[in-house]
Amino acid sequence: MKLSHFLTGLLLLLVFLSISIGTSDFSWEKFFAFDQQTWLLFQESRLPRTISILLAASSMSMAGLLMQTITQNQFAAPSTVGTTEAAKLGMVLSLFVFPSASLTQKMLFAFGSSILFTLFFLAFMTIFSVKERWMLPLIGIIYSGIIGSVTEVIAYRFNLVQSMTAWTQGSFSMIQTHQYEWLFLGLIILIAVWKLSQTFTIMNLGKETSESLGISYSLLEKLALFLVALTTSVTMITVGGLPFLGVIVPNLIRKRYGDNLSQTKLMVALVGANLVLACDILSRVLIRPYELSVSLLLGIIGSLVFILLLWRGGRKDAV
């Protein structure tokens, strides 16, 4: 049996569990009997939450894959080049400018901030010709820390700490109807990678080789940055941060299937969705009836895998 078939079956099982498990009892028997309360719970809470997990997880995993492709660095991802922290900064600035900022205003500020600071980071890495692959995440973590510190200072100075924490903590517990629709913008990056997978794969060969093969490298690089910034922004304003997801999932898949996006795109989306769904289900049952933050579980798993990847990458560069 193909791994993709197994992952698809596992995903369906996790979707079933995600809809079934929660603080409120959900009965499939009542669901198929068209019980009004059960259907209300399904439509207003369980279904939106499950859909938001699938969209956020698959799109953020794909954003990591795309970031690694355009930088030719396996450790690049929204969380390691400052994109995630920049989106958080944009959200805080939106709350400062508009105390009762709408989701649209938060989205625009987060998007503008994330694309601006990501461009600055990539320009810095290019100007100083940082060649070692393992240096990118280290510099990126420092860079993210600086942005995060500025964000904290602004939030503290203008009494926005509580609002910032509530909006940026990775959790799906508050997802309901009319609160997750922005995540459908994540479909843009999924469709783009699906349609342009061969073109993005050629970008792995570098700028000179890509342009010699007729690829408009600069245009596609800007498109990729736009897609990554958009995906990171809508995820941040809707569910908060999903740490290390964009790093570990593409790396695990590329080690098995190589750098051809035509072969990795589906697997990256499936593994990302399965991982976040599993973490979300665990977050509901570990201290039931209370919930843990999904970002906490993802952070524990992701940090361990990331350290292992970083250690192996450093050893290869040393050799």
Show which residues each predicted segment covers.
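Alpha-helical transmembrane segments in inner-membrane proteins
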Residues: 1-319
